[in-house]
Structures are given as C-alpha cells and as structure tokens.
Amino acid sequence: MSSSNKNRNTRSERMRRRRRKKRIIRGGLILALILAAAIVLVIALGGKQEEGTDSPSDENITISQSVPEEKEEDPVPTDTPAPTPEPLEISTEGLHSDYALLLRLRDDAVLMDKAGTEQMYPASMTKIMTALLAIENLPNLDEQITVTAEEINPAYELGASMAGFNAGETVTVRDLLYGVLLPSGAEACAALADRVAGSETAFVDLMNQKAQELGMENTHFVTVSGLHDPNHYTTFYDIAILLKYAIQNETFRTIFTTPSYTTSATEDHPQGIALGSTMFAQLGGDPKLDNGGVIEGGKTGTEDAAGHCLASLALIDGEEYILVTGHAPDSPDGTPYIIADARYVYNQL
C-alpha cells in the first residue's frame, strides 16, 4: 500500500474517533440534562404532595364536628331576704315609775328610756354590787363567818331591812349572800363587807373601783346597803350594765333567780332562816307574762328619795331583757307599782 493511501486511512480513522467521542459526550450531556430534569420534577411533585397532605384546602375538605347543645342551667336559688323587723316601740305612757330603762342583752340595745341616764338614788339595788363583789372575792361559799353586833345594830337603828341573823351567829358565805339578795338584809351586807375588805368603808372603795371597770360612769357608792346619802347615786343605765355583768356569774344568777331559800341550821336557828325574795313575793307567786314570757329574777329597792325600785330580768321568746324602774309610788292597795310597771313593759315585747 502506498504511503499516501496509508496517511488518508489514518486521518479518516482519527476523524471517526473524534465524531464518536463527540457523540458520546453529547449523549452524556443529554442524559445528564434528562436526569437533572427528572430530579427537579420529582422534587416539585413531592413538595406539592406534602402541601396537599399537611394543609388541605378548606374548599376541598369539610370537617364535620358535632357541637354539644347548651343546657339551660337551673336558676341558682337565692335566699329570700328576711323582712326587716320594724323597730320596737315600747310605750312609757302607762308607767307609774318616773325612771325606767329597758335593755336587750343580745346586743345591748336600749329599747326604752325614760330618764334612764339621769342621776337617781339606787336604794337597795345597791346590793347587786355588794353581792357580786363578795362572790368574786370569797370563792368558798361554805366558809363560816360570824355576824357581829356592830354589823347589825347600826342598820337596824336606821330602819334598814334585815335578813334575821343574830349577833354571834356563825353562818356560811352562801347563807349571807342569799340574805343580801332575797330579803335585802343589811346586816348580811355588812358581814360580807367586813370579811372581804376589813371594813365597810374599804369595801365601798372596791365597789367604786368595780363600777369604773364596768363603765358605770355616773355612779358613786357610799354605803354597802343603799341607805340614803346625797353622794350615793347612779343611773338606771348603769344599773342595767351592772346587772348584765353580774348574771354572767353562775352563783349570782342562781341566787338572783331563786324565789326562796332556807339557811343552814345554827344554834340560834335550828331550822334555819326561811328567806324569801321580795320581788317574787310581790309577784304573788306568778312570774309568767301575758305574752308567754317569764320574769326570771329581780332585786327591789325602797327608800324615801328613791321611791320603789326594781331591777329585773325577763325571758321572752328566747331573748333576755333587763328592766330597771324607779321612783314609783304605792298603789291604792299598798302594793308597789313596780310590779305593774314590769308587766306593762315586758308584755309589749
């Protein structure tokens, strides 16, 4: 073969190899482009599918949800407000006493006041304080005390009421206390005062101290029994305060509400002394009221300047009341009007 033919064959072969190489490259590029396009398409389709799964269109999907029916709530029961009670109107027109004050113990409400804060003489209502202080200072009610002539004679000579103990007679503290509050015995007051404080004067100082402690601002005591003295005075409001405090003491309350009592036997009185409450005696043995209430107890007082007085305790419809009346005259039959006044006031409740 000639050299020129050989050269031509060689060039032809190289050209064929180049063309083949170009075809391979073009094919690879086309395949790469197709592959890239396929990848892009897959990614695009996958994104749309995720969007369709996670966020469905409100237009294409309807969610059915049952809404519970609202129940009508039963109306909450409300308490019917209690009617406001009308204020009590206690008339004083039918009273014979010139001084009177009615106190409701539950709330210290003064329901009636007829000169109840004006200065007045307490007479034997004084003995409420005397008995109270003796009880607070002599806890042993069975303690023996001998009554002396000095404790009896002055009171007797002044015409004071007496319990009936004799000079030299030895009796219990309990007997003396009943002697103070039931028959209003002045000698019993003196005997207790001497035992507690050593003298009546020293005991009176204790009485005035106690009055100040209780807020009895318009009260001043001079005697232990209530015998008249111009400087021995109080108001019926102060007496009501005193009695309210005193009845909180069980011993005082028991004695104050007792109609009668017999003292212990002594040589002078082998059968004891029969003591009776002056208030219960004037009630005629009938403490009941027309409205179903009852007068539970009381302490009377009688003295020229004070007239007839009464500090009483009543229970009406489950409520307790204290009524203090004073400067009442005798009725035509000689019975003090204080009992009629007490019934008149209490029956209005």
Where are the regions a protein language model picked out?
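Active-site-adjacent loops and short helices of periplasmic peptidoglycan-processing enzymes
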Residues: 52-54, 58, 63-70, 74-237, ...
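Structured C-terminal helix/loop/strand segments within mature extracytoplasmic catalytic/sensor domains
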Residues: 2-82, 87-94, 99, 106-112, ...
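Penicillin-recognizing serine hydrolase domain
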Residues: 61, 87-99, 199-349
